[in-house]
């Protein structure tokens, strides 16, 4: 009887890892496809610090970065239940964050510090129980890896 429970436990853990890996891979591939021409984008959007500052200081622009879950521009993508871990909704949130990041590429998110700030803020929206609660979908370390912030410092 114990052997059956042990086997069932192993199967459950294995399945959980497979599901998490599948979601992580999907989100990573979405980000990679968005930024496959990242170097071209980086050279195209050479913006002044004045433009960057206006993005971060203008309340309307800042709202996109820090308060997107309340912004109508985001539509249903942040319409997640407080219980979280709804795979379809978590994927929608992930895609919405990627789209926002792409939109701000080279303006608000154009150096290492702003990239880290954006990644941390969006992960809080993605994983926070008061927002989407998608914590079991993607870890914070993976989230940071996807945004590849160190590439901005070179």
Curated annotation (Swiss-Prot):
Entry keyword annotation includes Signal: yes
Keywords associated with the record: Pheromone, Secreted, Signal
Maturation-removed propeptide residues: 17-52
GO terms of molecular function: pheromone activity
Pfam families according to UniProt: Euplotes_phero
Cellular localisation: Secreted
GO cellular component: a single term: extracellular region
Top-level division of the source organism's lineage: Eukaryota
Region forming the signal peptide: 1-16
Main location: secreted
Free-text function comment from the UniProt entry: Mating ciliate pheromones (or gamones) are diffusible extracellular communication signals that distinguish different intraspecific classes of cells commonly referred to as 'mating types'. They prepare the latter for conjugation by changing their cell surface properties.
Stated name of the protein: Mating pheromone 2
Organism in which the protein naturally occurs: Euplotoides octocarinatus
């Amino acid at each position: 009887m114990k052997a059956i429970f042990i086997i069932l436990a192993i199967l459950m853990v294995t399945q959980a890892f497979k599901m998490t890996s599948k979601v992580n891979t999907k989100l990573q591939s979405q980000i990679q496809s968005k930024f496959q021409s990242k170097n071209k984008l980086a050279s195209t959007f050479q913006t002044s610090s004045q433009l960057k500052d206006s993005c971060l200081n203008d309340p309307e622009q800042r709202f996109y970065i820090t308060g997107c879950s309340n912004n109508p521009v985001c539509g249903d993508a942040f319409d997640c239940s407080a219980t979280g871990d709804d795979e379809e909704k978590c994927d929608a949130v992930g895609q919405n964050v990627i789209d926002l990041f792409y939109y701000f590429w080279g303006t608000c998110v154009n150096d290492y510090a702003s990239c880290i700030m954006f990644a941390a803020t969006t992960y809080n929206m993605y994983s926070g129980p008061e927002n989407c609660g998608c914590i079991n979908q993607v870890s914070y370390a993976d989230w940071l890896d996807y945004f590849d912030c160190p590439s901005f410092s070179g």
